[in-house]
Amino acid sequence: MLKLICIAFLVTVLTLVAGEDSLDPAEYGCADDINQEDLLKKNDVCLQCEDLHKEGVVFSLCKTNCFTTQYFTNCVKDLEEAEKEPPE
């Protein structure tokens, strides 16, 4: 019985580790065949935008409808502008 529990635990851990670099497209309203690399990059834009604006709702709005809303576009622009600004 202990072996079975250990195997189940190991499988769970390996599944979590293997899935670290992948996201569920359905969570973002995207088609299942979306390129994972593109999904990760767009997700990162939304995370950076949320950090820039310091508001939790930004991430949710940014990723809506597979990153096709004006919120995502504005996040890209905001991040580009933030890069141009000299550090304080």
Swiss-Prot record:
Pfam families linked: Crust_neurohorm (PF01147)
Positions of disulphide bridges: 30-66, 46-62, 49-75
Signal sequence region: 1-19
Keyword Disulfide bond: yes
Alphabetized UniProt keyword annotations: Disulfide bond, Pyrrolidone carboxylic acid, Secreted, Signal
InterPro entries: Crust_neurhormone_CS, Crust_neurohorm, Crust_neurohorm_sf
GO cellular component: extracellular region
Cellular localisation: Secreted
SUPFAM superfamilies tied to this protein: Crustacean CHH/MIH/GIH neurohormone
Tissue expression as described in the entry: Expressed by the venom gland.
Lipoprotein found in the keyword field: no
A molecular function (GO) term: neuropeptide hormone activity
Protein family: Belongs to the arthropod CHH/MIH/GIH/VIH hormone family.
Function: May increase the toxicity of alpha-latrotoxin and/or other venom components. Is non-toxic to mice and to the cockroach Periplaneta americana.
Miscellaneous comment: Co-purifies with latroinsectotoxin.
UniProt protein name: Alpha-latrotoxin associated low molecular weight protein 2
